[in-house]
């Protein structure tokens, strides 16, 4: 069912990135990591780039003009890593047709944007799955363990990975770390525990858009998988604020016959962060 694409993994995996560099500033001692597709790489962010820490981005989700639910992304930082958590929950009529409750967690090295490990709790229709993935860059392998909470069965698998990968949530903020100059493009590797997907982004232009969070000048970025199991199966457009923050304001995905629209509703900041 196409509604399963509302899951955290299905939602974000169609996004991610392929081949001419966007020319962002790069750390002097951090070489770019090359993926399986020629030109696919993760470029370490400029020291001046900062993740939007201690904030929760809240998005409404629309499916064929129906209010489908809510998605959130929260970023926290400690001394060694950044922790990103994304949630996806259906609501209303869509929830009655196909219920989704997903939680996706990622640990990322903010100096390189290499994802260290991810975990995902998925409740999608009758399915209930727990997945944990550790990325071992020294051995160039990912180690995946998946538990079916309905049947009690466990599946384990290892996969080859390039020297650095991002994941289906952190990839948005990796993109935000780039300069996003009009007409530029890049490819980079994305992995959520299976085979690595190389996704190409192209900066199509800039226009003014209005979302519930406000009205902004925005940079429109097209993203499409160019290798792996999702090649040719979906396209995503993301509108980032046209400023140094590059806040993802709006997302529109086309997956088969389904179209999903995500719009930023609000940014929540804990009282202690004010």
Which residues does each PLM region occupy?
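Hydrophobic, well-structured mid-protein blocks that either form specific transmembrane helices
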Residues: 129-175
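N-terminal secretory signal peptides that target proteins for export/translocation
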Residues: 1-5
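Bacterial N-terminal signal peptides
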Residues: 9-21
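N-terminal compositionally biased, intrinsically disordered segments and leader/signal-like regions
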Residues: 8-9, 38
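Hydrophobic alpha-helix-in-membranes signature
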Residues: 20-23, 247
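Acidic, serine/threonine-rich low-complexity disordered tracts
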Residues: 27-139, 174-274
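Compositionally biased, low-complexity segments
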Residues: 10, 23-29, 166
